[in-house]
């Protein structure tokens, strides 16, 4: 039976001509018996530069035990991983989105090179999740993702805190609303151990997405990183991959149009990160499934926001587990008719079957009932208008104002904007414009958590809006409009906004407009000259030259 499952790896291990390969593998401890079994790749994103993925080495060991117990031979390899929380607000942040595609490339190359029969990808920090999903989808061999889990919240003066509160405290100190000593206390308390950032930020949004879309086993992601149950989650995942291999269930069997619609609905219902828009567009492209920004807006309009989660809500991510897990979210989606219950998942069961097993904690108010949502429509809005002809994205929780008209405060890059905010130069009703931070212009489309948190920390979260061709962290809150397309570096209208121009944001009408005549806009665009690329060689230059628009997922395209 094992031989029948070695559909790919026999090319590496079987026959007289493969004696050299077997000799090399025996040098690191594999036996003839090991090499006669299906070879399972363990794609690990463990790295010692962040808490998000630090537990994945131990988790991988348990996964490998499960693989061996189920009749397979595991072989572990690593990819790169960039921590958004560590690099935020620096030049290093440009590497974050770029790493998504490099992770996809790494897994694809390892799968092609070593001819693994199946792959489990261990993921945690933001870009490792979509990157691994993209790589597995390209290979289209049996495989799935296993999420490392959320960090526990910290505690400060009787309050639960996360990394979000550290960044907001920086702005509060700059505004004179908090002392440096208090900031240090928050810094020391916010991240008490391993795991991904602890709200419905990008990592937990994408972990939720992967269970709902069917590419992660239901019931695994919500278990926190430091929870003792994670060991058994890893072991069972190792056993499951052998079953997935026997059934020859592949990513593209799972990633249907219906599955993507389910995923978008989960982002809307949970108030998830706007980064999910980029990543789902990119993953859909790998799966060959048509998907556009309009799909996100349409699904969000009909899906209620039911999860009271940070950054704008009350609860941290571990409370999802305490409420009953992502199965409860799945049940809300299925019961409300917001998801296709017949969509298949990696366990071989449908989403409806998985949702039916949900055990909801009595009295929990983390995941609200459908008849008492936080608001009747989802948190994602897609805006267009003469400032964003190809679209832009904003995430709302329900308390934000829906109309804002004000003067543009224009900054060519994140650092200049941050200096102005910290320096007290931004006033109520200003609309901050940060441009040349898009996929090409950055390059790398940096997240603006430092800037948005400084705005909130300074007490301007309800009176100042921000518009950028860059991205936002999942920890961002307020009227922060990102992913503006076309970006400034491609000659989008954002490039010709001048200091003091009137901008109008109308969320009810899904519009963001520069209040100038068509003739004035045309004249400015005609006079605009593209800036020189910021990098002339290396990965940054290559990415800037090949990356597509944010409205297409910011994916690399073949010239």
Swiss-Prot record:
Its cofactor is [2Fe-2S] cluster; Mg(2+). The active site is at 473 (proton acceptor). InterPro entries: DHAD_IlvD/Edd (IPR050165), Dihydro-acid_dehy_C (IPR042096), DihydroxyA_deHydtase (IPR004404), DiOHA_6PGluconate_deHydtase_CS (IPR020558), ILV_EDD_C (IPR056740), ILV_EDD_N (IPR000581), IlvD/EDD_N (IPR037237). Its EC number is 4.2.1.9. GO terms for molecular function: 2 iron, 2 sulfur cluster binding; dihydroxy-acid dehydratase activity; magnesium ion binding. One of its GO terms (biological process) is L-valine biosynthetic process. It catalyses: (2R)-2,3-dihydroxy-3-methylbutanoate = 3-methyl-2-oxobutanoate + H2O; (2R,3R)-2,3-dihydroxy-3-methylpentanoate = (S)-3-methyl-2-oxopentanoate + H2O. It is an enzyme of class 4 (lyase). [2Fe-2S] cluster binds at residues 52, 125, 197. Belongs to the IlvD/Edd family. This is Dihydroxy-acid dehydratase. It comes from Roseiflexus sp. (strain RS-1). The lineage of its organism: Bacteria, Bacillati, Chloroflexota, Chloroflexia, Chloroflexales.
């Amino acid at each position: 039976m094992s031989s029948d499952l070695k559909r790919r790896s026999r090319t590496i291990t079987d026959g007289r001509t493969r004696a050299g390969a077997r000799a090399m593998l025996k040098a690191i401890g594999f036996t003839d018996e090991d090499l006669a079994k299906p070879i399972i790749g363990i794609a690990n994103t463990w790295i010692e530069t962040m808490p998000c993925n630090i537990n994945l080495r131990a988790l991988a060991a348990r996964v490998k035990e499960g693989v061996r117990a189920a009749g397979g031979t595991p072989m572990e390899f690593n990819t790169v991983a960039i921590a958004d929380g560590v690099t935020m607000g620096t030049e290093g942040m440009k590497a974050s989105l770029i790493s998504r595609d490099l992770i996809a490339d790494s897994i694809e190359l390892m799968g092609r090179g070593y001819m693994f029969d199946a792959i489990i990808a261990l993921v945690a920090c933001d870009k490792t999740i979509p990157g691994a999903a993209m790589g597995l989808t390209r290979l289209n061999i049996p495989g799935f993702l296993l999420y490392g889990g959320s960090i526990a919240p910290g505690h400060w003066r009787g309050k639960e805190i996360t990394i979000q509160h550290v960044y907001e405290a920086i702005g509060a100190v700059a505004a004179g609303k908090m002392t440096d000593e208090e900031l240090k206390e928050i810094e020391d308390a916010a991240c008490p151990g391993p795991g991904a950032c602890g709200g419905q930020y990008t990592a937990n949004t994408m972990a939720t997405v992967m269970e709902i879309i069917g590419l992660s086993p239901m019931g695994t992601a919500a278990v926190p990183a430091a929870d003792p149950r994670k060991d058994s989650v890893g072991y069972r995942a190792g056993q499951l991959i052998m079953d997935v291999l026997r059934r020859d269930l592949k990513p593209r069997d799972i990633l249907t149009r219906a599955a993507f619609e389910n995923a978008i609905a989960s982002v809307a219902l949970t108030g998830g990160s706007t980064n999910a828009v980029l990543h789902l567009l990119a993953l859909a492209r790998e799966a060959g499934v048509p998907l556009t920004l309009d799909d996100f807006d349409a699904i969000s309009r009909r899906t209620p926001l039911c999860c009271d989660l940070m950054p704008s809500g009350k609860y941290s991510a571990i409370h999802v587990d305490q409420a009953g897990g992502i199965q409860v979210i799945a049940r809300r989606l299925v019961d409300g008719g917001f998801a296709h219950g017949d969509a298949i998942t990696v366990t071989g069961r449908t989403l409806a079957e998985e949702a039916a097993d949900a055990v909801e904690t009595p009295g929990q108010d983390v995941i609200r009932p459908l008849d008492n949502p936080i608001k009747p429509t989802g948190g994602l809005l897609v805006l267009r208008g003469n400032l964003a002809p190809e679209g832009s994205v904003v995430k709302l929780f329900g308390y934000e104002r829906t109309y804002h008209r004000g003067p543009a405060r224009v900054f060519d890059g994140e650092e200049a904007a941050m200096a102005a905010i910290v320096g007290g130069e931004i006033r109520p009703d200003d609309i901050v414009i940060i441009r040349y931070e898009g996929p090409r212009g950055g390059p790398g489309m940096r997240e603006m958590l430092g800037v948005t948190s400084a705005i909130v920390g300074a007490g301007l979260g309800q009176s100042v809006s921000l518009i950028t061709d860059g991205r936002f962290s999942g920890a961002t809150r307020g009227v922060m409009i990102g992913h503006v397309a076309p970006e400034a570096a491609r000659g989008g209208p954002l490039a010709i906004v001048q200091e003091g121009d009137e901008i109008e944001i109308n969320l009810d009408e899904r519009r963001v407009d520069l209040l100038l005549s068509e003739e004035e806009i045309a004249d400015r665009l005609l006079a605009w000259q593209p800036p020189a690329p910021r990098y002339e060689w290396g990965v940054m230059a290559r990415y800037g030259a090949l990356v597509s628009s944010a409205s297409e997922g910011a994916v690399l395209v073949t010239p």
